[in-house]
Amino acid sequence: MVIKFKSNHFRDIMRICGPITSTCPDDREICRYISLVFYYDVCEAYGSNGHQISKVEVPCILKNVYPRFTLLIPPLKVPPRTREVEIHVDEKEKEYELMYLDEESDVIGAYKYKFFEGEPLDYESFYIKAQENFDKYNNGEGKYVISVNPKYLISALEGLKSCDSVIINFGSAVEPFLIRSGDESVKTSALLYPVRMT
């Protein structure tokens, strides 16, 4: 099996899914690695630390890859000169080789990884439930759709990082919402205004 990505698509996977994977060696593999699920020239990539899940869909080229094939890869830094990323899967040896190629298709980096036992079926059910929730909200089934500037959301949450939990109070889709500490000993809050959706 061969899987090919343009470098910008593979970088998107690492940028979106990599930062939220767990760095704790005692966590399950599904929380320490990025899951790639392949469907007919589309890759759904998921990253999770057990408390949140990020997902991105990118195009890819598949050769001899069956639908719903799942592969776990570590968060990686992509070399700057990379133009294409190839993954060669050897199911017999239960390993894969990830290669970074430059403009002339010369290999500028290659790394081999072993499969985890139970891959992919043990991991598939975890993301099936997540996908149901992504679909539900993407289809407008959420109670409110609120658009916020991500910089303001991040800075609002930055001040609450020391709290064990936060409580988010919504009024309506056009009213500001309140993010406050769920910890009684720390009385802090932030009010965030929505931005207009076009």
Describe each PLM feature range:
Residues 1-198:
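DNA polymerase processivity clamps
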